[in-house]
Amino acid sequence: MKKLLILVSLTVFSFSNAIAVTLYDALNQTYQNNIQLNAERENIKASEQDINISKADFKPSLTISGSKSFENTNTLKNQNGGTATKNDVDPFTTSIKLEQTILDYGRDLTLERNIISLNLAKAQLVKKEQDTLHNAINAFTNLILAREKFNINSKNLNLLIKQVENDKIRRDRGQITNADVAQSESSLAGAQAQFAISKSELLINKLNYENIIGKINDPNTLKKNSNSIVSIPKTLNDAINLSKQNNPDIQIAKLDLEISEKDISIVESDLKPTASVSLEKSYTDDLSSTIGERDKDTLKATVSWPFSLGGKNKYKVNKNTNLTTRKRLLLDDIVKTNETNVASAWSNMEASKSFLNSVKVQLKSSKIAYEGITAEYERGSRTTLDVIQSNSLLLSAQLSLVSSERNYLMAQYNLLKAVGLLNSQYLKLK
């Protein structure tokens, strides 16, 4: 028993010479290094390049070209059928052309669409931030919970080891029976099993933490918080109003609808006129048998207005109209669902808070009862079973408290996520 007690004591993580890791530190680490977030940031950069590409269509194009041809006339006859003199030429032509599109409805609409797409990419990044940071908070709090359960079960195991040793001494003195010792040993076996489980859970949650957030050497360095590191909405109405403005799912659905509406306009622009002007300067050497060289300037204006594309345009408009109707319905559904989700998150937070307060009262009562029963047991007025049952209730209350504290904290962050505030800007991450 003594060897087991020493082993348990050595297994518990030490707090000495450790630098505390706060939730804010862990979230910053996740925000900077998470692969999925970095991928979404690249998506924003790609959307920015789409805007640059669209803007380039508004600028003039400059084309330089040159050609060289070699001619070999095999037969050349006059109108009367006689053979004409063959004078082969090898023309060489160079040109430079400056062209500017001055009217293109599709070009304007495409730029507007790409600007909306950039806003969509930013909203998708916010959504990914929420999911990633929520996972990080979950991993952080789960590791703290596993650590506390491990410590509680460790202390309980040490307590029951001493209990068995004391009961054996009292049995040898004739104060209790073998049945009492057997009860203590049975309780110890259960505590050993719970300790093994809590040790395994601690390892699993440590690995999960490292997978989501990053390397951690000692789980005891994690600093526990009772409340969220940022303020939460004060009332349910405040939460609902904030969610309408900030929930990324709503923002994404709105932007998807705007893009779909813009797609209709782009398709319709296929039947609208376009206009361009160009200026070309060309030089040709050895142009023909009668002309040695030519230097020419050409100013050209072009207007194009397609009137029919065989019905293809009509079907494209119909298709995009159907898609727009679909996205409008999806937006309406998300807006309705959002209010329900926020109300549910708020209700769960309030319930978690009430349950936590009840567990605190339960733990206080369990401590008083255990101390009283233990004292009475020492005086011989209580049985071993009374002590074991009282200790079991105390252990249950202790485990329930740490779980309730964690659940209440997560409920606060669940509300922030439902509202749309669990992002880098609101959390002030760098």
Each predicted region: which residue ranges?
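Periplasmic alpha-helical coiled-coil/stalk elements that build and connect Gram-negative outer-membrane
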Residues: 21, 25, 131-245, 256, ...
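Bacterial Sec-pathway N-terminal export signals of envelope proteins
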Residues: 18-67, 73, 216-258, 306-307, ...
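Amphipathic alpha-helical coiled-coil segments
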Residues: 39-54, 128, 132-153, 162, ...
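A glycine-/polar-enriched beta->alpha junction
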Residues: 28-38, 45-60, 95-113, 119-130, ...
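Positively charged n-region of N-terminal signal peptides that target proteins for export
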Residues: 1-4
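Small/polar, glycine/serine/threonine/aspartate-rich low-complexity segments that form flexible
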Residues: 65-100, 223-233, 265, 278-316, ...
